[in-house]
Amino acid sequence: MAKLRLGALEAGGTKMVCAIGDENGTIYEQVSIPTTTPKETIPKMIAYFRDKGIDALGIACFGPIELDRDSEKYGYITTTPKLAWRDCDIVGQMQEALHCPVGFDTDVNGSVLGEVTFGQAQGKKCVMYLTIGTGVGGGIYSNGELHHGMLHPETGHVLITKRTADTYAGRCPYHKNCLEGLAAGPAIEERWGRKAVDL
């Protein structure tokens, strides 16, 4: 039986990682495309996948995103702090261009699923995956299921009590001083005047 040829898209706030692999977790190739605006970035992702002969595409995306399949906005990036991407129908655009099934979940749920399926969390029943990058997020896998909806932790937007001497206001457009607004990569760069990788 032939292996499925699968496309994978890790949609991040700084870069979009596009890859081709199979159901056994083998990655055949991958590219990184800078995340600018949907108008610039989505056509580049479509161009990468268009001639790859994929059977399906999985998208693990920064959020918040709409995961309710009954919603007219299923597949949209919704109230993201990445303003250019607000109300972007990423699934619809990819599906229309590539004519294949598209799976869609949060970037952190994609990461935790990868760890449970192929990585360090194989065989575990309950796993939480935390990430700090352009944003802050957390994904939960418990008893064979990824958590969604009210059970999905928007970890990055938990409000934080700062030290009284800390005068940094934070950079989240919604809460300012949430975890993401204070500790994600852009906040670190703004606080220290250098990229986090250089600290």
Ranges and model annotations:
Residues A2-G7:
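Extreme N-terminal starter segment of soluble prokaryotic enzymes
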Residues L9-T14, T131-G135:
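A short acidic Gly-Thr/Ser loop motif
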Residues T14, G25-T26, Y76, E145:
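Residue-level signal for well-ordered, solvent-exposed loop/turn and beta-edge residues enriched
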Residues C18, I33, I59, I188:
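Residue-level signal for inorganic ion chemistry
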Residues I20-E23, E29, K39, G103, ...:
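Glycine/GP-enriched mid-protein hinge/lid loop-to-helix segment characteristic of carbohydrate kinases
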Residues N24-I54:
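N-terminal phosphate-binding loop and adjacent alpha-helix
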Residues P38, I42, A56, I65-C126, ...:
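Glycine-rich phosphate-binding loop and adjoining helix at the ATP-binding site
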Residues L57-P64, I132-T134:
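Glycine-rich beta-strand-to-loop/alpha-helix junction loops that act as flexible
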